Amino acid sequence: MALWLGLRAVLVVAGLAVLLQLIRGWLSSKSYVFNREEIARLAKEHSGLDYEVAFSKIIVELRKKHPGHILQDEDLQWVFVNAGGWMGSMCLLHASLTEYVLLFGTAVDTGGHSGRYWAEISDTILSGTFRQWKEGTTKSEIFYPGDTIVHEVGEATSVQWSSGTWMVEYGRGFIPSTLAFALADTIFSTQDFLTLFYTVKVYSKALLLEASTHLSQLGFF
C-alpha cells in the first residue's frame, strides 16, 4: 500500500511537471494581441489629463486598434479588488487565458503585498503616485504620472498608492494563476461575495468575447 501511494505521488508530481512545461512552451510560442510597450505608450500619452477623460480616450483608442477584443460599454464595470492587504478598484477591458488589460486605481491611500505571479504585469500611471519596495532591498521608489512600473514573473514587492492614483495595467502570462491572490481576501477576509460574483462575471464575459472573436477570425461566424 505504501509503495502504491508513493508511486501515485511520483506520478502526480511528474504529471504536474509535464503540464507546467507544456504551459511554459505554449506561453513562449503563442502570439499575443497586445504588448507592454503599446499599452505603456498609449497610457503615457494621456497621463496628466483628468483621469476619467484619459480613461475614455484610452478605451476609444484600444477599440480602434483592436476591434473585437475590448468589452463594450454595457459590460464595463468598476469592481472592488481586495488583495494582499490593499483595496482598489478595477475596470476590466480585455481578458483571455494569457493577457489582460484593465484600468486600476484607488480613491483612498492604500498599500500591501503585490502578490507573486506566473505573469508579467506592467502599470502606467495616469495620476497620483505609486510607491514600490522591492524584495531584497532596503529602500522604496516612488513613481509618478507617465511612469511605467514592471512587475516581473515571480517577483514580490510592497506596494503603496496615494489617494487619487489611477493607472492602466497590462498583464501577460498564465492569467488564471493570478486569480487565487486576487480573490483570496474577498473569500477569506471580506467575504464580499457580491464582488466575487462581479469579478467572475466580467472575466467570463471577456473570455466569451475572445472566444467569439477568435471563432469569427477562423470563419465560423
From Swiss-Prot:
List residues in topological domain: Cytoplasmic.
28-221
Q: Which residues lie on this side of the membrane: Lumenal?
A: 1-4
| Gene coding for it | sigmar1
Please explain the role this protein plays, according to its UniProt record.
May function in lipid transport from the endoplasmic reticulum and be involved in a wide array of cellular functions probably through regulation of the biogenesis of lipid microdomains at the plasma membrane. May regulate calcium efflux at the endoplasmic reticulum.
The protein's UniProt keywords, in alphabetical order, are:
Cytoplasmic vesicle, Endoplasmic reticulum, Lipid transport, Membrane, Nucleus, Receptor, Transmembrane, Transmembrane helix, Transport
Q: Cite the domain annotation text.
A: The C-terminal helices form a flat, hydrophobic surface that is probably tightly associated with the cytosolic surface of the endoplasmic reticulum membrane.
What does the record's miscellaneous section state? Sigma receptors are classified into two subtypes (Sigma-1 and Sigma-2) based on their different pharmacological profile.
List all membrane-crossing ranges: 5-27
Q: Name one GO biological process term.
A: lipid transport
Q: Enumerate the InterPro entries for this protein.
A: ERG2_sigma1_rcpt-like
Q: What is this protein called?
A: Sigma non-opioid intracellular receptor 1
Its record classes its membrane topology as: Single-pass membrane protein
Pfam families under this entry? Answer: ERG2_Sigma1R
**GO CC annotations?**
cytoplasmic vesicle; endoplasmic reticulum; endoplasmic reticulum membrane; membrane; nuclear inner membrane; nuclear outer membrane
Q: Where in the cell is it found?
A: Nucleus inner membrane; Nucleus outer membrane; Nucleus envelope; Cytoplasmic vesicle
Kindly indicate whether the keyword Cytoplasm belongs to this entry.
Answer: no
User: Where does the record place the site Important for ligand binding?
Assistant: D123, E169
Stretch list, region C-terminal hydrophobic region: 174-221
Q: Region entry Important for ligand-binding: which residue ranges?
A: 96-103
Which family does the UniProt entry place this protein in?
Answer: Belongs to the ERG2 family.
